[in-house]
């Protein structure tokens, strides 16, 4: 992965009337998917030696699709985008496009440095992805003009619609939100900060039709609060290992079954967050471990992430059993 420099002058294809039409169609598909189900962020499968296990990824993604998600986001944070080289990324996104076969939108991850973001955007476009989630950069702080400028430049280099992601060092001001919403091809914002005061200001400032997503860690915890400020759609890490639990929560929330929502939060989601917070990186490591406990061929995480300790794995096993029992008992 290269330094954050713009060395490729032919990284994209620009925008135009055909792009505008395609973007509108993707937005409508995303909007429909958001209303229908949770957003799936599949894991990327690896062999024990750390190499890509594409067959394992395909098998895992099939279980995700069978649960009826609103959209699929391969090679994003949960999919360990940070660790994938260009060829691995191409294989993962291509497999996701082939398996979904148009059933739901495929939104591939890209981001970090400018040159890397542009190259991966081209790969995703060539693979047939529907849109891109622009993951935050790291290590360097950037002013608002820089955050907006990165999206402007990326939008010039790809026909794919872009969803900005604010998390970590990336936080958009209200004025920046207005600016990025005017960029052709930028269609939405995923929020991982959980600053609901700021988020409410952003949703009020956005033009009609601009998409917002709850991207908080274990988003179900704050799903009701996000919905109250106009952001009901959310990503679900739990869906990656227990779509039954994620689906039951989503249905209870959608249908206004407050007692069922609170029971799942109290007995499964809150303990899961407490377990997740024990060790940095468990936001991915625990999810993969839980998927392995269910017989999914997802393999280990890649460094610098580490797999859960024996004690934490035992707690995860017990908690997973509790969650599945809750769903099996119809809450």
Curated annotation (Swiss-Prot):
Pfam family, one: DHDPS
Compositional bias (Low complexity): 10-23
E.C. code: 4.2.1.41
Name of the featured protein: Probable 5-dehydro-4-deoxyglucarate dehydratase 2
Region annotation Disordered: where it falls in the sequence: 1-23
Organism: Streptomyces avermitilis (strain ATCC 31267 / DSM 46492 / JCM 5070 / NBRC 14893 / NCIMB 12804 / NRRL 8165 / MA-4680)
InterPro entries named among the record's database cross-references: Aldolase_TIM, DapA-like, Dehydro-deoxyglucarate_dehyd
The keyword ATP-binding appears for this protein: no
Superkingdom: Bacteria
Lineage of the species this protein comes from: Bacteria, Bacillati, Actinomycetota, Actinomycetes, Kitasatosporales
SMART domains the record matches: DHDPS
The keyword Ribonucleoprotein is assigned to this record: no
Pathway(s): Carbohydrate acid metabolism; D-glucarate degradation; 2,5-dioxopentanoate from D-glucarate: step 2/2
Assigned keywords, A-Z: Lyase
